[in-house]
Amino acid sequence: VQAGAPVDVEVRACGRQYPERLDDMAWENDLVGFRAYGPALQARGERGFGYDLFTKRGTAAPVLEDMYAKELDADSWKQVNELRKTDPKAADELVRTFSYHIDHGYGMDCYAVGPTLGAGVSALMVNDTIIYPWCYKTQEVLDNGPLRFTVKLEFNPLAVKGDTAVVETRLITLDAGSHLNRTAVSYSNLKESLPIVTGIVLHEPDGAVVADAAGGYMTYVDPTTGPDNGKIFMGAAFPAVVKEAK
């Protein structure tokens, strides 16, 4: 064995919390980006739970830092707010020049989440009712590149049947070259075994949906938030036995 120098590796997986955007936890690799909603959003009374996602194209390099910086630029929004007083149409056009909801050549956020499971999140289910803990409470980044991103999210205690302080912990890993997160979900203070549901929100109920319990996967073609954005091919796969898929 000989001593050597490590080879530099380009960053292909990374992420961080964005306190400047209501505590978003956002992460990406060379193919796709995601975010989970944080405590500052919940403090405003909003309810977000499922993953949001960012499409990427034309680059393998990280883009979320740039997307967030442009979306949140105070000077840009100052110009927009001034324009809205006299020319709302021009103000809207200005927003389109920097918004991450518009593709500027490297991808965008054209996915809608709201109070749903979003892009393939899991939750407890009681009597056909999904139990949402809503936004995460704490976060800890365990791996931050260059080829793997891992974050541990812990959620607020919630009441589940007779248990009053059930806490979800979610360990999320995204590797370079993968379109899919690997997620391990656990619950503390839960005395009774309960079903866990994993879902993808259907923005177009009559769209192309495949749910295969025997095969352990489900897929969905999402129409995105606008007709000019194309479609997003969603999916989830399960290493454990799936009892029911619908």
Language model features by range: what are they?
Residues 1-5, 151-155, 236:
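Short, hydrophobic/aromatic-enriched beta-strand segments in well-ordered soluble domains
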Residues 4-127:
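Solvent-exposed N-terminal domain segments of exported/luminal and surface proteins
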Residues 17-18, 25-27, 133, 137-144, ...:
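Short, exposed beta-strand/loop patches in secreted or surface proteins that constitute
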Residues 38-40, 153-157, 198-202:
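A mature extracytoplasmic/lumenal domain signature
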Residues 42-44, 157-164, 226-231, 243:
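Short, surface-exposed beta-strand/loop "edge" segments at domain boundaries and coil↔beta transitions
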Residues 111-157:
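Active-site cradle of extracellular carbohydrate-active enzymes
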Residues 140-144, 149-194:
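Acidic, contiguous internal or C-terminal segments within carbohydrate-active enzymes
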Residues 189-245:
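Polysaccharide-binding surfaces and accessory modules of carbohydrate-active proteins
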